[in-house]
């Protein structure tokens, strides 16, 4: 009789999870950062807030961003004036946009990743979809399955409200799925549309302005799998180790709340400080078991934020 351990071993991949393909997509509407403050304060009827606009201009100038892509055009915003106000009830209007646009943008990125992968989409065994832009049921994972024409029995995982660490979260999950399911090919999609967070400026909520200066719309897709098929699949990266941690004294540093006015967010000024105080400990936990002390000798990723966090 075959033992349980032998069955479990046969069900698992032999090698580490690898990223086999990458695809990205953005809305057609491109916004130049240098002129965005003029547009933003005009479309939100806030041009009388001269000092606040000057502050926002400085934020944009220091952002190290030259351009962004946004689903929200001038025409869309004029048709939905409640979205342009600071805290006007507008969730219905926002939801109507994102429940359609989020999976559509995700499809664009996924199609590119599948094409680069070079295998038929029928070989996709798992789907992970992650977004902070809107919540619906059935979710964006279901909508993407239909848009791509995936098999109905693809194993789906829908993740909402992960915020800035969405990318790291889906990579961690994809690695576990690929390594513990022999032959698994995981389609991973993150798609964000800032229609859910866009709002007019407020003198009392400057951290909202930081988001208006930094955030853009886009989607990214990966194919993740272990034991690449020789001469057909071409792995780009191997994922050796993933983890997640809660930094001490970080509660309230980054908050998001879904309200009638959309998704509101709050950022403390000390977020870069919290990251810098705790990054060394996280690196030691990651690399010490592997016998690595020179962090610059290998490729690793910490969650990237604005320039203050990266610095």
From Swiss-Prot:
Catalytic activity, EC: 2.3.1.74
Molecular function terms, GO-annotated: naringenin-chalcone synthase activity
Reaction catalyzed: (E)-4-coumaroyl-CoA + 3 malonyl-CoA + 3 H(+) = 2',4,4',6'-tetrahydroxychalcone + 3 CO2 + 4 CoA
Class in the EC hierarchy, top level: transferase
Any matching Pfam family: Chal_sti_synt_C
Active site: 164
Metabolic or biological pathway, per its Swiss-Prot or TrEMBL entry: Secondary metabolite biosynthesis; flavonoid biosynthesis
SUPFAM superfamilies xrefs: Thiolase-like
Organism domain of life: Eukaryota
A Gene Ontology BP annotation from the UniProt entry: flavonoid biosynthetic process
Sorted UniProt keywords: Acyltransferase, Flavonoid biosynthesis, Transferase
Gene3D superfamilies: 3.40.47.10
Family the UniProt entry places it in: Belongs to the thiolase-like superfamily. Chalcone/stilbene synthases family.
Purpose: The primary product of this enzyme is 4,2',4',6'-tetrahydroxychalcone (also termed naringenin-chalcone or chalcone) which can under specific conditions spontaneously isomerize into naringenin.
Protein name listed in UniProt: Chalcone synthase 4
Organism lineage: Eukaryota, Viridiplantae, Streptophyta, Embryophyta, Tracheophyta
